Amino acid sequence: MALGAAVQADLLTNVDRQDEVLLLDVIPLSLGLETMGGLVEKLIQRNSTIPTAAAQVFTTFKDGQTGLDVHVLQGERELVEDCRSLARFTLSGIPPMPAGMARVEVRFQVDADGILAVTAKEQSTGTTQSITVKPSHGLTDEEIENMLLDSIDHAEDDIQLRQLREQRVEAERVLMDAEKQLGEHGALLQDGERAAMEAAMSRVRELAKGDDSHAIKEAIHALDESSRPFVERVMNQAIRRVVAGHSVEEY
């Protein structure tokens, strides 16, 4: 990592040597994917020596989701709109499952020539989709330097924006789950619980429209607390259904 940083710094400051040392010796800008909320998840960090590879497992956000959009990005910023788009494709054929159950491994592999191969594989079926791209194509040294300087200038704001969007995504997930549980297991609610949960849900929904990530986080926590007894009854009912008709020896 230190060697890669030294090479990159030299390239940005010493024009005379740019013909001798290629940008392809290291990854000049981080490579990643778009995730929920328009955020960038970096898989290969800037200044990684090549060839190199990295993989990460992602999942679905909604029940019954059968496709996963893969948006490949380049850059150091935290938001999609502030990074360079390299490629897009969709992995189709994911078996319908509850949200969060599917497992899709996305692998980035950069060869010695700087060619990036991106492969997405749904783990239960083996369904695979891939694409190749050359990240350095059409990118000048000056543009790379400007992107790096831009990321430094906006580092603090980017962190705050990322935290806000992460909390908004979590708020959306929690609200979808709460609505699902109320719809499917409302009969398990006790006196006053529905009103308390719906009030907490309204609070989360309203704060998620604002810009206070801490307030959103606190509202999500309050919803979790208000729904805890109800959720425990839902889980206990599910466990009883699973063990019904089975002896202890079977487990």
Annotate each language-model stretch with its function.
Residues M1-Y251:
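Oxyanion-binding/catalytic loops of NTP- or PPi-dependent enzymes
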